[in-house]
Regions:
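Residue-level signature of catalytic and energy-coupling elements of molecular machines
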Residues: 5, 14, 33, 121, ...
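Short glycine/threonine-rich beta-strand-turn micro-motifs
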Residues: 1-2, 26-42
Length: 179
């Protein structure tokens, strides 16, 4: 009842603020948040939980909770990017690139978290590079960043590979890592 609001105004305000569709089911206590964008979905989830916990669900409070959730999700992404760089042994990336990398934390592919897949790839690439005498640092960085284009592939034209190359070039990543 409170989530929907009078004549659906709360649901409409929430959908407008988050860009996520709200599906209210007959099952009590359940709301489905639907979006192809995993970051929007996470912002909506965090905001909805805060609204339900607070109990005061109204358009002004919705805006406030969504803005707080945006900041929280952004901060979580940045922290996850920093952790991934540490775990993968890839230091000294541009802070904005680390934040973009952290957005992969909210994405899955074939049921696996894309950020942790990238960390695993970086560590495997390092082992293989060591075995064959290749540059371990380049292999680590290339593997960690190989899916970076997936963070914005739904917002920008091109394949995630093409987008990733443009992102890495923008932040001055060396050509050996990009190729």
């Amino acid at each position: 009842g409170k989530v929907i609001g009078k004549e659906g105004r709360n649901v409409r305000a929430f959908e407008r603020a988050t860009g996520v569709d709200v599906l209210v089911d007959e099952t009590p206590g359940y709301v489905v948040l639907s979006s192809f964008d995993p970051i929007r979905r996470e912002i909506a989830r965090v905001a909805m939980e805060a609204l339900v916990k607070d109990g005061r669900i109204q358009p002004a409070k919705i805006e406030e909770c969504v803005e707080t959730a945006r900041k929280e999700v952004s901060q979580t992404g940045r922290k996850m990017g920093e952790k991934a760089c540490y775990d993968a042994g890839v230091p000294n990336l541009h802070p904005d690139l680390v934040a973009i990398l952290g957005r992969l934390h909210f994405r899955t592919s074939y049921g696996q978290n894309v950020l942790w897949h990238s960390v695993e790839m970086a560590n495997m690439a390092a082992i293989i590079a060591e075995e064959v005498g290749a540059d371990v640092a380049v292999a680590r960085a290339g593997a960690l960043l190989h899916d970076i284009g997936k963070t914005v592939s739904h917002e920008v034209a091109g394949t995630h590979v093409e987008i990733g190359i443009r992102i890495l070039q923008k932040y001055g990543v060396e050509e050996a890592v990009i190729l």
